[in-house]
Amino acid sequence: MNQVEVALDTIPVHVTVNSEPRLSHRPSGLYPMFLLAVLATVMMLFAAFTAALIVRRTGSDWVPVQIPSVVWLNTVFIVTSSILLECAKKAFSRGSGSQASLWLGYSIALGVLFLIGQLIAWSVLNDQGFLLSTNTHAAFFYMLSGVHGAHVLGGIGVLVWTLRRALAGAYGIDQYRGVAHAAIYWHCVGAVWIHLLVLLSIT
């Protein structure tokens, strides 16, 4: 019995330590494909709205309205929000998760302010008597800003989910692709709004 124990003690044991970085928090290859599909859908949707507005604007019953001034402040909100998302990405690349989470929180707050500002713009137009049924220009503003606002709301949901993962330590120096993908969508939503604002401002 002792000889067996001695023999077992002399068997070499090799332990392999996996030094590869953890990939559990990295999105799979399906995420970029899904993102591209979403962006393509958004672009086609607003391209159709753009064409409809251009055609409708040539009608004899087109009466332009003054875009509420709060809309320009809203534009500053959403542009600044995109800039702060880029700051968050850079903070993650430096390994500063707490700073990145702070930038994400500010970006979300500005997105919420943007939506509140759009509701104020609707209220201003309504108080001036420009309703969906009484003015075509105002109707397009309600429709386009409403559809766009729905996409902004969806983007805020994604950013909130991203922030929760960031606070849970899911992202690091080499593990923040999820943040990058969320930023791409948010930048797209911001660019679409600038396009719509220019389109609606040209009377």
Q: Which stretches of residues belong to each language-model region?
A:
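...captures the hydrophobic TM-helix bundle architecture rather than a specific catalytic motif
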Residues: 1-203
